[in-house]
């Protein structure tokens, strides 16, 4: 008997994303200290998919119109993690086991649209990607990540 593929957020994840999107939500120190603002940037979330809009104001540039690659990788890890989180069952959580970020062109200023998608979800692993699009619609970067999926209690 095959298991039906779920297409909605689990109850746990509905609650998680509600807190994440609230202005007074308690963000983990790593996210807060990096200046990632999901309450402002997360525009859409559904099973296996997130859309972020990051207002690139130049504050993370190493040169004019060149964002520091480490910042892109950190933001990418957050976004692919949120993409994977959207596909978790109640009681599950995740950790990154591999992250690859490729920059195709310098990241311009303005709104950067980032689309995260679930590529594959197994019982204990998942694979996710995120594409960074510049305001002109050109693909500027792509991140891909493998995620270990465990019961949340295993992380305690």
What are these regions (language model features)?
Residues 1-156:
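Terminal targeting signals and extreme-terminal segments of soluble enzymes
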């Amino acid at each position: 008997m095959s298991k039906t593929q779920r297409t909605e957020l689990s109850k746990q994840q509905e609650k998680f994303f509600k807190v994440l999107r609230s202005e007074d939500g308690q963000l983990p120190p790593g996210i807060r200290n990096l200046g990632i603002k999901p309450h402002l940037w997360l525009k859409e979330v559904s099973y296996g998919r997130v859309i972020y809009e990051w207002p690139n104001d130049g504050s993370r540039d190493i040169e004019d119109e060149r964002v520091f690659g480490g910042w892109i990788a950190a933001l990418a890890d957050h976004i692919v993690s949120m993409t994977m989180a959207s596909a978790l069952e109640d009681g599950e959580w995740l950790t990154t086991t591999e992250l690859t970020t490729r920059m195709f062109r310098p990241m311009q200023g303005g709104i950067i649209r980032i689309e995260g998608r679930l590529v594959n979800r197994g019982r204990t692993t998942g694979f996710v990607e995120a594409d960074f699009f510049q305001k002109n619609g050109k693909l500027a970067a792509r991140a891909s990540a493998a995620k270990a999926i465990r019961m949340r209690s295993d992380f305690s």
